[in-house]
Amino acid sequence: MKIKTHNFFNIGVLTLFGTFFTIPLYSFISAIIITSPANRIIDIYGHEKNGLGMPVRTYRTHSPVRALFWGFIPALLLFAAVYYIKKGYEPILPTPYFILLQGLLSGELHLLLDLPTNGGIFINKKRFALGHFAYNNPLINFAAVAAGLFLISISFTGGNYAKDYNNIKYIFWNFRRQV
């Protein structure tokens, strides 16, 4: 996938994930700050040229365990900055631990979008691909960008219902009574 596609999709998923812990604006800002460098690191550091001069993915960044690490680096830096700033403004800023979780997810979401492409990802040092689409396939890239924008819109329009246990209990209780 293209780097823009990775960024839109990751920002959408991480924003929605972060709304379970804080307000959508904080989640959106932290998702932008984490996603852009994490995807850059994974794509730039994780490609090298083969014997024909074609860029190919490497095991260095496109494996599930190592992607956790590469996504966690920008999150750790942001967490340290927010934690340091938060000391003076305790009641205003939320606890920034969700930023670390967003960082862990960021690398794995990058791999999720690379899975249906020709290059695939590496599992146990062997290449694995679910589909064989070109990385610049406009339909696949558009679908991922649209999904990311949809998730961002859900998170800003009240998609954080999981915070309230009573809403979940009410939904499942009514579903069970109807069946």
Label every model-predicted segment.
Residues 1-179:
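N-terminal membrane-targeting hydrophobic helices
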